[in-house]
Design a protein with these regions (language model features):
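Short, low-complexity N-terminal intrinsically disordered segments enriched in polar/charged residues
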Residues: 1-35, 153-165
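A solvent-exposed, acidic/Ser-Thr-rich amphipathic alpha-helical stretch
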Residues: 19, 23-85
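Short beta-strand edge/turn micro-motifs at domain boundaries
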Residues: 92-94, 98-156
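A short, basic/flexible loop-to-alpha-helix module at the beginning of a structural domain
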Residues: 140-166, 317-330
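N-terminal Rossmann-like FAD-binding beta1-loop-alpha1 element of flavoenzymes
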Residues: 158-193, 340-350
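Flavin (primarily FAD) cofactor-binding/catalytic cores of flavoenzymes
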Residues: 166, 189, 194-196, 237-340, ...
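Conserved Rossmann-like nucleotide-cofactor binding loop
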Residues: 176, 198-199, 341, 364
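Glycine-rich active-site loop/strand segments that organize a redox cofactor
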Residues: 205-242, 363-436
């Protein structure tokens, strides 16, 4: 009986919650929550991605949404058991609303709800055709008018965007756009991806020669089609490019290559976009109801402007345009920046016999890849996690169940352990002059990524080259100007250079809205990315969720989708369900639409 005690606790709590919500007794429901509670909802109650922090916010949300949501049938998820450790009871849960089925995660403390995650799994009557409902494929029987699968796909490709319009247009065909389009395909939402490159996967292939994913394979699966079990831990850029190209074909995506989105505008009366694209040398006008910008966090380059750039006689380019090291053997290179791209490019240049200097203008968080995998990701995304029964879906939901408000409290001990383990490594870097940080509150890489999307390097070898002096370093300085053959730094140092690489990062995705739609719409939407943590590059006030990502924005029918492969996989589910509901005319009363505090 003892092993069933956690189940009994959770079942009793869920039963009480079910009864209170069904009866519309808000106070009774709210009393089931801890004072310092967190309820993170992915679409089910709020038609938004929203975290309620504390009882008052839970009460306010329920008061606004309960009548429309009609939640019921709360219980421990089928086939699951609750567990208990250190005074916290954990459980996977399931429930329904009037229009959907939900899945979630619960943490109980002292008999009350401490953290609650609710996510929309599917819309009733609009389930994905999987399992027993998978399509037959072959059509048995005799039919003189039979069309093959290939003929049907060719007909669809010829008609969509011409004789019939897509419901959704996705601008950007990297992993974000591809993952979302795959979800929408399964939900029967007519969708076209607009991609400027010649082939799917080119956004990876065309990056610098040495690029590999820094996240391990277990973290990077796409929806429906995980990587094979023999896939390398870290994917080389061309290999991941080929995988994305294959994925677009087998998932039957309508992917328009060599197509440039010229402009877009929204008609408030018809509630329809006009999207002008150029394809095969001719202009095509698309009329979707929904527009998704999946142009990527690493798509709009931040190109600095330094005095003398027009005088420099050597090669200079942003890291996104770096062709690789081959043509620079025996020459001198200066790389401005100290994050992932800067380190990768410096290491590749050194390997090719280039005299390379990194210019580090501000502190950078460094974490060794093996330490990150073992201590930071190992419990959720590793071969050990897989062998213990952890699935990608569960790992994603466990990560999602930690409210951003307190996530740093879970991350600080992780990075303290990494600092202790790799103390000698960090000492050698500091001795070489490298300026280190561990996040402004010591919470490390993940929080830095969520807050600002930059400021770190996952070390796969370049840090050792800096520590031993193979890669030269100038830190704590900025660029003053360029001359014909050199870079002059703010401390007066002159660095001779045949090549200057600006590894200076990328701008907000909001910039694409300004370019494609208008500055007015970009300002109306506001800054994209960040939590409002009031840390560097993430100004307050506190938002509690990523600004404008995967959820409704202040511009009707305009959405932003992107992030790393993990986020592209996980959040594509919830964005696709929001779009499907709107296509089907299902009411989607949005609660807590994000206010705009900062422009892009």
């Amino acid at each position: 009986m003892l092993e069933k005690a956690p189940n009994g606790k959770v079942a009793a709590l869920l039963n009480a919650l079910d009864k209170a919500l069904s009866a519309g007794e808000l106070e009774r429901a709210v009393e089931l929550f801890q004072t310092d509670c967190y309820w993170r909802d992915l679409v089910t109650f709020t038609w938004n991605i929203k975290t309620m922090e504390g009882k008052d916010q839970v009460r306010d949300m329920l008061q606004a949404q309960l009548a429309d949501t009609k939640p019921s049938n709360w219980k421990i998820a089928d086939g699951e058991d609750a567990s208990e450790a250190d005074g916290i009871t954990d459980a996977w849960i399931q429930f329904e609303t009037g229009v959907s089925r939900g899945f979630g995660h619960l943490r109980m403390k002292d008999g009350q709800i401490w953290t609650l995650l609710t996510t929309m799994s599917e819309l009733k009557g609009h389930e994905e055709p999987i399992g027993f409902d998978r399509p037959m494929g072959a059509k048995h029987g005799a039919d003189r008018n039979r069309k093959t699968w290939k003929e049907e796909r060719e007909a669809e490709a010829a008609e969509l965007g011409h004789s019939c319009q897509p419901y959704c247009v996705i601008v950007g065909g990297g992993q974000g756009g591809i993952a979302l389009a795959a979800r929408l395909r399964q939900l029967n939402v007519p969708t076209i991806i607009i991609e400027k490159n010649e082939r799917p996967g080119d956004s990876w292939r065309k990056r610098y020669k040495s690029l590999c994913l820094h996240d391990p394979v277990w973290y990077d699966h796409l929806p429906y089609l995980p990587f094979p079990r023999n896939w390398p831990v870290f994917s080389p850029k061309d290999k991941i490019g080929d995988w994305l190209e294959m994925y677009t074909k087998v998932m039957e995506l309508n992917y328009w290559t060599s197509t440039v989105c010229k402009k877009a505008s929204y008609d408030e009366k018809s509630r329809e976009w006009t999207v002008v694209v150029e394809r095969d040398g001719r202009e095509i006008v698309l009329k979707p109801k929904q527009l998704v910008l999946a142009t990527g966090m690493s798509a709009k380059a931040n190109m600095p402007k330094f005095e003398g750039m027009d005088m420099f006689k050597g090669d200079q380019h942003h890291s996104s345009q770096h062709p690789g090291p081959d043509k620079y053997k025996g020459k001198k290179a200066v790389v401005i920046g100290s994050n992932n791209s800067a380190h990768d490019i410096c290491a590749a240049l050194w390997e090719s016999g280039v005299d390379v200097t990194m210019v580090q203008r501000s502190t950078t968080h460094i974490v060794k890849s093996d330490s990150l995998m073992e201590i930071g990701l190992g419990s959720l995304y590793s071969e050990q996690a897989v062998q213990s029964g952890m699935t990608t879906a569960k790992a994603d939901l466990i990560f999602a169940s930690l409210p951003y408000k307190i996530m740093h409290e879970f991350q600080i001990p992780v990075y303290n352990a990494i600092r202790e383990r790799d103390a000698d490594f960090y000492k050698r870097l500091e001795k070489a002059g490298f300026l280190l940080d561990y996040g402004e509150d010591g919470s490390g890489l993940f929080m830095k990524y969520l807050r600002r999307g930059s400021g770190y390097y996952i070390d796969v070898g370049a840090s050792e080259l800096i520590a031993d002096g193979s890669i030269k370093l100038k830190s704590g300085v900025d660029v003053k100007k360029l001359t014909e053959h050199s870079v002059i730094l703010s401390d007066g140092t002159e660095l001779l250079a045949d090549l200057v690489v600006y590894a200076t990062g990328y701008g907000s995705m909001n910039g694409w809205a300004a370019d494609l739609i208008s500055k007015h719409v970009a300002d109306k939407v506001g800054k994209v990315w960040g939590l409002g943590s009031n840390t560097t590059k993430d100004p307050g006030p506190w938002e509690g969720e990523q600004r404008n990502m995967w959820k409704p924005t202040q511009q009707e029918a305009l959405w932003f989708h992107g992030g790393n492969l993990h986020q592209s996989r996980h959040y594509s589910q919830f964005l696709s369900l929001q779009l499907k509901a709107r296509m089907e005319g299902i009411p989607t009363p949005v609660y807590g639409l994000q206010k705009v505090h900062h422009l892009g």
